[in-house]
C-alpha cells in the first residue's frame, strides 16, 4: 500500500471536536466585511507574499474572504478563491474564479493535480477538524516545488475552533501545524514568528497581533 496516497492522522477524535458542532455554512451565511487581523499583521503578510510568491504564478487562497492581502503590484497568472460566503468572495476582486465548499465535511479540492503553485491559508487552519486530509489534498494540487503558506495569530471564533486549537498554547499550535505538514506530503517548514513588545499604556491600545507563519514546500 502506497502511504503517499493516504493521509497520516495526527489528531484523535476528541481533538477534532468543537464547542459548536452546528452547521458551518449557517454560521458563515451572513457576510463579515471586517478585518479579523490588525493592520500590522496584514502588512507583515503582504510583505511576506511579496517575497515568497513569484510573478505569473497560480495562487489558491483557501478558506478566504473579501480581502486576500496579496500585493496589488505583483503579476499573477491566476488567483483562485475558496470560502463559505458567496458575498465575501464576490467582493474580492483579485479572484479570477472561486468556489464554495465546507472542507470539514467535503475534503476533496475540485482542482487538477499539480495545477497550483501556491496555496495560502490565513486565519483558517484553526477551524480545520480534518487537517490531515486537506493537507494531503493540497499536496496533490500543488506543482512540484509548490508551497503552502499558513498564517495565523491568536484570534479565532473560539466556539468554531476544534479542541486541538482551543486547548493549546500559541507555541503548541505552531508545532501541531508543523506535524501535520511533515506527516502529509511537505518538507520541513520555515517558521516565522513576529511579536511586538506590549505598549506602555494601561489600555494596551498599541499592542499588535502576534504573527505566525509556516511556509512548506511540497515533497
Roles of regions detected by a PLM:
Residues 2-54:
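Class I SAM-dependent methyltransferase Rossmann-like catalytic core
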Residues 44, 168-193:
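Short alpha-helix
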Residues 51-109:
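Class I SAM-dependent methyltransferase SAM/SAH-binding core
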Residues 106-119:
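A short acidic, Gly/Pro-enriched loop at the edge of an enzyme's catalytic core
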Residues 117-132:
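A short SAM/SAH-binding and catalytic strip from SAM-dependent methyltransferases
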Residues 132-147:
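A short glycine-rich, Lys/Arg-flanked "PGG" loop and its adjoining helix->strand segment in the class I
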Residues 147-178:
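Conserved class I S-adenosyl-L-methionine
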Residues 185, 199-219:
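Core SAM-dependent methyltransferase catalytic element
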Amino acid at each position: 500500500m502506497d502511504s503517499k496516497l493516504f493521509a497520516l492522522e495526527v489528531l484523535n477524535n476528541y481533538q477534532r471536536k468543537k464547542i459548536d458542532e452546528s452547521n458551518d455554512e449557517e454560521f458563515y451565511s451572513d457576510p463579515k466585511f471586517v478585518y479579523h487581523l490588525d493592520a500590522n499583521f496584514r502588512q507583515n503578510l503582504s510583505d511576506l507574499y511579496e517575497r515568497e510568491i513569484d510573478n505569473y504564478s497560480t495562487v489558491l487562497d483557501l478558506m478566504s474572504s473579501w480581502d486576500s492581502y496579496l500585493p496589488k503590484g505583483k503579476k499573477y497568472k491566476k488567483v483562485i478563491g475558496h470560502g463559505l460566503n458567496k458575498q465575501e468572495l464576490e467582493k474580492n476582486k483579485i479572484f479570477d474564479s472561486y468556489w464554495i465548499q465546507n472542507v470539514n465535511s467535503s475534503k476533496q479540492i475540485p482542482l487538477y493535480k499539480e495545477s497550483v503553485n501556491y496555496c495560502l491559508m490565513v486565519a483558517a487552519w484553526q477551524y480545520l477538524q480534518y487537517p490531515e486530509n486537506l493537507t494531503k489534498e493540497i499536496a496533490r494540487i500543488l506543482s512540484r516545488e509548490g508551497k503552502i503558506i499558513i498564517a495565523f495569530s491568536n484570534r479565532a471564533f473560539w466556539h468554531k475552533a476544534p479542541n486541538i486549537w482551543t486547548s493549546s498554547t500559541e507555541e503548541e499550535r505552531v508545532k501541531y501545524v508543523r506535524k501535520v505538514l511533515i506527516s502529509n506530503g511537505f518538507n520541513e517548514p520555515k517558521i516565522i514568528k513576529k511579536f511586538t513588545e506590549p505598549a506602555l499604556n494601561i489600555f494596551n491600545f498599541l499592542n499588535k497581533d502576534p504573527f505566525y507563519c509556516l511556509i512548506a514546500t511540497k515533497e
